[in-house]
């Protein structure tokens, strides 16, 4: 199975296979607001290729160098090592030790966080309604 990928700005977009018929051991995932609140969003600049130990990356001097060289200026994102301490399942480590973040997994945690906040909001609205009706 494969998805479509294309590069735009500072990322790639994927169509991820999600058909229920391809999955098993399906359980609810409760990662949400508590974990999201621990994540630090950073502003950063990519190092130049000559500032990086390219041996950390499987195919040194290929797309990584092109991506880094083409991504000058400030960026917004996360640090894989920090994400790993909160959501280890969202970080992959190569055999050389380079880390990547699975942003789609964080997206699903955000969905759960929004659902949690919505439930809290609904409960507060109901409480206000009951207090005003007293």
Give residue ranges: language-model regions.
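Small/polar residue-rich beta-strand/coil "junction" motifs that cap repeat-based extracellular fibers
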Residues: 1-25
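Phosphate-proximal small/polar/acidic motifs at interfaces that engage nucleotide phosphates
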Residues: 79
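Internal, charge-rich low-complexity segments
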Residues: 45-59
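C-terminal intramolecular chaperone/auto-processing assembly modules
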Residues: 18, 23, 58-68, 88-134
């Amino acid at each position: 199975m494969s998805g479509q990928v294309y590069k735009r700005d500072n990322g790639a977009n994927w169509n991820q296979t999600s058909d229920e018929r391809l999955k098993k051991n399906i359980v609810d995932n409760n990662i949400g607001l508590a974990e999201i609140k621990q994540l630090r969003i950073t502003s950063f600049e990519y190092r130049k290729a000559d500032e990086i130990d390219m041996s950390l990356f499987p195919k040194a001097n290929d797309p990584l160098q092109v991506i880094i060289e083409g991504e000058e200026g400030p960026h917004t994102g996360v640090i894989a090592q920090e994400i790993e301490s909160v959501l280890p399942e969202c970080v992959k480590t190569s055999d050389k030790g380079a880390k990547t973040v699975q942003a789609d997994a964080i997206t699903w945690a955000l969905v759960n966080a929004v659902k949690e906040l919505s439930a809290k909001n609904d409960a507060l609205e109901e409480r206000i309604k009951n207090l005003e009706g007293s």
